[in-house]
């Protein structure tokens, strides 16, 4: 169940429940993308709205909910991906984690996301090709999927829970890790 957002919700609580909120706030209102328009996790949504041209909190909340709904449509579970791979589907799993994370552990058959791969995808891959992005917990991959969707890719997905969920739900032999 999705948590209700109210004016006193802190930004940390908001981002915990709605990971795409920062992306949505930046896209719609230029909030949270840089030092001059950033916010502190302890600030409430109401205070952030107040210092950004007194934005109506209800409008901002609706923007976050709409973005969250769009994000949910891009999600695909580790179990569904595993089933499809076992059935022989050729799914591009694009891992957007850091090189260190990739070197430590990665899903067999996944491809490490590089600048060169991004250029290839943007210029050569069909816009209707299904692409599944993977990261540690499913947040960076959701940002990547959203970015590619914004550039016209129609079938981008993000693996819910990332490689961490994959290691719990699909492949318990895959090491779990924590970034400090």
Predicted regions and their residues:
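Phosphate-rich cofactor/ligand-interacting catalytic cores and adjacent structured alpha/beta frameworks
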Residues: 95
């Amino acid at each position: 169940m999705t948590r209700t957002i109210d004016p006193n919700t802190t930004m940390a609580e908001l981002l915990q429940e709605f990971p795409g909120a920062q992306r949505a706030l930046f896209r719609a209102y230029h909030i949270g993308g840089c030092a001059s328009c950033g916010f502190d996790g302890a600030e409430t949504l109401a205070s952030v709205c107040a210092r950004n041209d007194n934005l109506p909190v209800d409008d901002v909340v609706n923007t976050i909910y709409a973005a969250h709904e769009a994000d949910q449509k891009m999600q695909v579970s580790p179990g569904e991906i595993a089933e499809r791979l076992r059935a022989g589907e050729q799914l591009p799993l694009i891992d957007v984690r850091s090189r260190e994370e990739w070197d430590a552990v990665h899903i067999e058959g996944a491809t490490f996301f590089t600048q060169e791969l991004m250029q290839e995808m943007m210029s050569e891959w069909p816009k209707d090709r299904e692409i599944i992005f993977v990261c540690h917990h499913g947040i960076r991959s959701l940002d990547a999927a959203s970015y590619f969707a914004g550039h016209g890719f129609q079938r981008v997905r993000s693996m819910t829970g990332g490689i961490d969920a994959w290691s719990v739900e699909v492949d318990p032999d895959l090491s779990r890790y924590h970034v400090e």
